[in-house]
A protein has these predicted regions:
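Flexible, acidic active-site loops/lids enriched in D/E/S/T/G that coordinate Mg2+ and/or position polar
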Residues: 51-75, 81, 100, 104
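N-terminal Rossmann-like NAD(P)+-binding subdomain of aldehyde/semialdehyde dehydrogenases
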Residues: 41, 62, 85
Length: 113
């Protein structure tokens, strides 16, 4: 399956493949990052992309799943965070020029979970 095809699968299909160890969370994340890199210059949908940390999280998920510690259907799935939620150490502008340099020192509760 091509990288583009992986990103076009439903989240439930991606989750099933990850759970069944037929798809690596790292492979899926790399596919998503490649798609962002290819299309975001045109779409401008992302303010900040944290590719390195996303890959780190995917590697951890892959190790956990390989060790039989699958935590549920969202485990190992890539996700984006709207720029209106505080993310510790990551530029969070709230879509405003006034907040153009805002880098929170804490995560929003929904991010912590």
């Amino acid at each position: 399956m091509s990288a583009d095809e992986l990103t076009l699968l439903s989240a439930s299909e991606q989750s099933r493949l990850i759970r069944d160890r037929k798809l690596s969370p790292v492979e899926l994340m790399q596919s998503c990052l490649a798609r962002i890199e290819r299309w975001d210059p045109l779409l401008r949908a992302y303010i900040t992309v944290c590719g390195d940390s996303a890959l780190d999280v995917a590697r951890v998920a892959e190790r956990e799943i390989a060790a039989g510690q699958w935590r549920g259907p969202l485990h190992g799935l890539p996700f984006g965070v709207k720029d209106q939620l505080n993310t510790k150490g990551v530029l969070t502008t709230l879509g405003s020029k006034v907040m153009a340099t805002n880098v929170p020192d804490h995560d929003a509760t929904v991010i912590q979970r």
